Amino acid sequence: MARGGVPNFGGGNINNLMKQAQKFQQQMEEMQGQLENKKFQASVGGGAVTAIANGKKEIVDIRIKPEVVDPDDVEMLEDLILSACNEALKKAEHETANEMKKLTGGMNLPGMF
C-alpha cells in the first residue's frame, strides 16, 4: 500500500491522474463548444415542417411550407411541429451521446450531458 494508506495514489500517480482529469475536462469543453455550434435538422410530413435544433438542445428555427397551413386543421400543423421538434432534439441528443462515448471510451458517465 502506498503512503497515506491509499492504494495506487503514491508518488507521481496522483499527479498523472490530475493531468489526465484536466486534459479530459479540456476535451469535454472543446466538444461542448463544437456541439453547441452544430445544427440538427428534422423534417416531417414530406418536408412540410422542418425543425432545427442546436447542440444545446434548443430549437433555433422552424420552417413551415405555406401550403400546409390550413386554418380548418390547425391540429395537424401542431402535430407536425411537435414531431419535427422532437425529432431534431433526438438527433442532437444522439450526436451528443455518440461524441461523449468517443471521448470517454464508452464509459457511461451520468449527468455529463
Swiss-Prot record:
GO CC annotations, alphabetized: bacterial nucleoid; cytosol
Keywords: Cytoplasm, DNA-binding
Compartments, as annotated in UniProt: Cytoplasm, Nucleoid
Transmembrane segments: none
Matching SUPFAM superfamilies: YbaB-like (SSF82607)
Function description: Binds to DNA and alters its conformation. May be involved in regulation of gene expression, nucleoid organization and DNA protection.
Name the UniProt record assigns to this protein: Nucleoid-associated protein CTC_00074
